[in-house]
Amino acid sequence: MSQTVKAVRIEAFGGPEVMKFVDVAVGEPGPGEARIRHRAIGTNFIDIYQRAGVYPNPLPLQMGMEGSGTVEAVGKGVTHIKVGDRVAYADNPPGAYCEARVMPAKPLIKIPKAISFETGAAMMLKGMTAHYLLKRTANLQKGHTILFHAAAGGVGLIGMQIAKRLGVTVIGTVGSDEKAVLAKKYGCDHTIIYTRENVAERVKAITKGRGVDVVFDSVGKDTFQGSLDSLRKYGLMVTYGNSSGKVPPVDIALLKGSLFLTRPSLFPYTQSREELELTANDLVKLVASKAIHIPLERTYAFADVQQAHRDL
């Protein structure tokens, strides 16, 4: 039996004002699907990219890539979740900005009562991103030293906590003294205020001329060259975002010093259920046990989604 729910849809790319509430019909799940009732929805910088058309999707587009809630129904063949389970997810293509939805069951991860729905909706995209970057892309080990750009951002604050559990020394870039205090609270050993310091020079000073083993760079165009200059011989450059703009085509000669460059993204690392659980189950355990803390900067009513985007 179908039900009508509110959802947020865009029919053109643009600012927050292009997001409109619409009524959508939600039916019964088919094979391999589940219907969930959202209790919380996550907002992320990638939502802005998609809304603005930087990462274009076919229009009209129902927004949102992560959420949490309870399972209302499951389709044939779904065995890893059942009706009544508390679940959270991050998934692509988008569709999370709604009261309820039918979706593939594969990305749904059970969360215990120790994790609130608000935390569940805030931890999946940023938390799984931080987890796979550090533990799978870079395979960080005790004794490594890393540079994390935007250390006071969502991925940075989670990533630094994971890094410290691995015995890694963290150098983080931030934009202000206030953000430096926040980054240190979450485990950053050394902060660089990029608005008034040369990042590569400070990295070399901190590491006594050696450079870092890995750079995690979500900023893109503005930080790319400085990131390469911060690496040690055989160092790894992990570029996973472009908040300052896309990195221009790279001259391979920039990698002199036997450097390595990679551009990973989350969803290839979670393509199968087995790969998803490698990251998601460990993240859930860490959060439920309070080994790491998921920062919740603020919450909004569903009706205030446009303001949430303005504040991102």
Model-inferred region functions:
Residues 2-3, 273-312:
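C-terminal hydrophobic helical "lid"/dimerization subdomain
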Residues 25-42, 52-95:
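Glycine-rich beta-strand-centered segment in the early N-terminal region that forms part
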Residues 198-209:
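Short amphipathic alpha-helix with an adjacent loop that forms part of the alpha/beta core around
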Residues 88, 147, 215-216, 238:
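N-terminal Rossmann-like NAD(P) cofactor-binding module of classical short-chain dehydrogenase/reductase
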Residues 86, 145, 169, 235-236, ...:
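Short glycine-centered segments of the SAM/dcSAM-binding site in methyltransferase folds
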Residues 174-177, 222-292:
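Glycine-rich phosphate-binding loop and adjacent beta-alpha segment
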Residues 121-197:
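Mid-domain Rossmann-like dinucleotide-binding core that forms the NAD(H)/NADP(H) cofactor-binding site
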